[in-house]
């Protein structure tokens, strides 16, 4: 009788030893994700009103393109990593059940890299669109900007948006799980594509809103709410109403001032205080979502 109990005890200790590295990795991944996002937001806030300069007035596929894409990647890291953290941690938890901790850790970052690659590539399409608009007309008319906001608002309630939002919220491990580490790249791409389908027009509206940090923060909160709250349709429909109404006002009132324009005139001290409060809220929401999804 003692021998089986001893084996059970040893097995229990071994199981605990196997779980501890996974738990530590879980925490390390969360800290690194939020640290990267924090650093990216610091860059955006430090740039202040100059963020829009390399992103709103490109001239050719050269240095301007590189500057645009670099700032686009920073923006994606700042805005999308906090919203993707729950899915990343869920991926790591499941992968760690069938692989060694080190393999699960590497696969998780392959998943993250593939996810960010989708958003980085979307920057090429965004640059091409801005370049075409700049060639046609130096500054988009207020009416066109208003129509862009209205289209983005209408998209919020379309079946395609709802399907992509549902797939973006649903753990990919439930539908497309593969045990090989190499497949982590494919799963990251797939998750990125669904998130792109869900959020792409929310990034398009940043251009008519002036690419201000305030507009980026507002869009981040919309995406975070759509991906983490229990009733995401309230966020989507609320954003739809605001975008359609504000876009309509821009169409009928061309001289309407930009709601987010004043953010670019805030002092560094105000930005620091505002950013600290906002980031605490983002961290709280992301941490709650991560705990819920990984559990």
Model-found features: residue ranges?
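Hydrophobic cores of alpha-helical transmembrane segments in multi-pass inner/ER membrane proteins
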Residues: 81-83, 146-158, 216, 275-286
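Juxtamembrane transmembrane-helix termini in multi-pass membrane transport proteins
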Residues: 4, 10, 69-116
